[in-house]
Amino acid sequence: MASSTLSPVTQLCSSKSGLSSVSQCLLLKPMKINSHGLGKDKRMKVKCMATSIPADDRVPDMEKRNLMNLLLLGALSLPTAGMLVPYATFFAPPGSGGGSGGTPAKDALGNDVIASEWLKTHPPGNRTLTQGLKGDPTYLVVENDGTLATYGINAVCTHLGCVVPFNAAENKFICPCHGSQYNNQGRVVRGPAPLSLALAHADIDDGKVVFVPWVETDFRTGEAPWWA
């Protein structure tokens, strides 16, 4: 007469779609009793139930992406890589660029950006994030002559929506999620991002920087703005 027992074992499984997570499996052990009263193992094949994990270019889930975006906001204008300072005022998830009406630019503390004060602490060539249209993280650009550029650059990557940091050492924007690259004006120069970063007008109204939707021709490409 035979009896069966179930014992848990831990297995690493694989699937056609990529790697799978460690999972708990059941190993069926039929026990055959011989004439001496001893059991003789005859193992059957293991059936493993694992949750499949997509391979390679896996996109972080939304919670992790939002956390990454928040961590990047405070340090993207720093030349030293890896120094991440969270800015608590940028909790609004990024949109797709654009908007309607003028929106005062907000700094990392949530204060209105005063153009003259901003230029005292941000040198020529600087690109620092502020909160812009629709709550999107938007770069204010200081031109090489020390003046504030008349445009802001939306930091939302046109591939999958990550916040793109500015790499001062390479003088371009490089997305940490999938490696898309944009020049220092936000024009796409390397995929997988299909489009350039969105623009917004950076006007000065009563001393304050105000973002206004950009609906004219994109000066970087000579084409109509995709975000308008």
Swiss-Prot record:
Q: How does it sit in the membrane?
A: Single-pass membrane protein
Needed cofactors, names only, are: [2Fe-2S] cluster
Classification via InterPro entries: Cyt_b6_f_Rieske, Rieske_2Fe-2S, Rieske_2Fe-2S_sf, Rieske_Fe-S_prot, Rieske_Fe-S_prot_C
Question: Which top EC class is named for this enzyme in its record?
Answer: translocase
Q: Where in the cell is it found?
A: Plastid, Chloroplast thylakoid membrane
- One term of GO molecular function: metal ion binding
Task: Report the CDD domains cross-referenced here.
Answer: Rieske_cytochrome_b6f (cd03471)
Cofactor binding annotation: Binds 1 [2Fe-2S] cluster per subunit.
A Gene Ontology cellular component where this protein is annotated is:
plasma membrane
Q: Which reaction does it catalyse?
A: 2 oxidized [plastocyanin] + a plastoquinol + 2 H(+)(in) = 2 reduced [plastocyanin] + a plastoquinone + 4 H(+)(out)
The record places the transit peptide at 1-49
Give the principal location in a single coarse category.
Answer: plastid
Which residues bind [2Fe-2S] cluster per the record?
157, 159, 175, 178
* EC code: 7.1.1.6
Protein keywords: 2Fe-2S, Chloroplast, Disulfide bond, Electron transport, Iron, Iron-sulfur, Membrane, Metal-binding, Plastid, Thylakoid, Transit peptide, Translocase, Transmembrane, Transmembrane helix, Transport
How the protein assembles, per its UniProt entry? The 4 large subunits of the cytochrome b6-f complex are cytochrome b6, subunit IV (17 kDa polypeptide, petD), cytochrome f and the Rieske protein, while the 4 small subunits are petG, petL, petM and petN. The complex functions as a dimer.
Function, in words: Component of the cytochrome b6-f complex, which mediates electron transfer between photosystem II (PSII) and photosystem I (PSI), cyclic electron flow around PSI, and state transitions.
Q: Which family does it belong to?
A: Belongs to the Rieske iron-sulfur protein family.
Name of the featured protein: Cytochrome b6-f complex iron-sulfur subunit 2, chloroplastic
**Which gene holds the coding sequence for this protein?**
petC2
